From Swiss-Prot:
SUPFAM superfamilies: Prokaryotic lipoproteins and lipoprotein localization factors (SSF89392)
Name under which the protein is recorded: Outer-membrane lipoprotein LolB
Quaternary structure annotation from Swiss-Prot or TrEMBL: Monomer.
HAMAP family, per database record: LolB
Annotated organism of origin: Stutzerimonas stutzeri (strain A1501)
Sequence similarity: Belongs to the LolB family.
Keyword terms of this UniProt record: Cell outer membrane, Chaperone, Lipoprotein, Membrane, Palmitate, Protein transport, Signal, Transport
Length: 206
C-alpha cells in the first residue's frame, strides 16, 4: 500500500497542477502544446487596441447577406461599423462600459447599457458582442466556461462557449502577433463568417 501511495502521489500532484494551470473555466484538448498555448494566449491578451477591416457574412432565420466590417478598439472604447449585411445599410455600434449606442441607417440612433441588449432589441440578433472582444483575437472570454481545441501550432482551432461554436480557419502574423484572419461563428440561429483583410494591433496600456 505504501509503494502504491508513493507512486500515485506525484501523479496526482502533476494532474492537479495541470488543471490549475489551465484556469477554472478552461478545458483544453487537441494536438497542440498546452504550455505553448498559455504563452500565446498571454501574449495576445496584452493587445488592448486594434483596427480591423474586412468582410462579414451573416445567416439568420429567413435572411442572409454580406457586407464590410470596420472595427476600432481603444482599450474599453469600441467602434464597430457594418455596411451592407441583410440589406440594412450602414450600422454602427459604439460605446464604453455601461454606455452603448447603435446607429442604423434610415432608423435612427438607439442607446442601452449593454451591446447585447441593444443588438437584440434593434436587429433581433442574440450576439455576444462582449465575447467578440476576445474571440476576434483568438482567445476565449475569461468570464465563463469554455471548451477549447488547439491546433498543432498551439493556437485556438475551435471554441465552444455560452452556446456558441467558433472555428478559426486561418491565422497570420501582424506586428509580432499571430492573429485570426478567418473565423466562423455559429449559435442562437446565427452563422457569421469574418474575413479580416487588415489587422493593425496595438498595445495602448504600455
Amino acid at each position: 500500500m505504501s509503494l502504491l501511495k508513493n507512486l500515485l502521489a506525484p501523479c496526482l500532484a502533476l494532474l492537479l497542477a495541470g488543471c490549475a494551470a489551465l484556469g477554472p473555466h478552461e478545458s483544453v484538448e487537441g494536438p497542440g502544446n498546452t504550455a505553448a498555448w498559455k504563452e500565446h494566449r498571454s501574449h495576445v491578451a496584452t493587445l488592448d487596441g486594434w483596427q480591423i477591416s474586412g468582410k462579414i457574412g451573416i445567416r439568420a432565420p429567413q435572411e442572409s447577406g454580406s457586407g464590410t466590417l470596420f472595427w476600432l478598439q481603444r482599450q474599453d472604447y469600441f467602434d464597430i461599423r457594418l455596411s451592407g449585411p441583410l440589406g440594412r445599410g450602414a450600422t454602427r455600434l459604439t460605446g464604453r462600459p455601461d454606455a452603448v449606442s447603435l446607429e442604423v441607417a434610415g432608423q435612427g440612433r438607439f442607446e442601452a447599457e449593454s451591446p447585447e441588449a441593444l443588438v437584440e432589441a434593434q436587429l433581433g440578433w442574440q450576439l455576444p458582442v462582449s465575447h467578440l472582444l476576445w474571440w476576434v483575437r483568438g482567445l476565449p472570454a475569461p468570464d465563463s466556461r469554455s471548451r477549447l481545441s488547439i491546433d498543432s501550432e498551439s493556437r485556438l482551432a475551435r471554441l465552444e462557449q455560452d452556446g456558441w461554436q467558433v472555428e478559426y480557419l486561418a491565422y497570420a502574423e501582424h506586428n509580432g502577433f499571430v492573429l485570426p484572419e478567418r473565423i466562423r461563428l455559429q449559435g442562437h440561429d446565427l452563422q457569421i463568417t469574418l474575413v479580416i483583410k487588415d489587422w493593425q494591433p496595438r498595445q495602448l496600456g504600455r
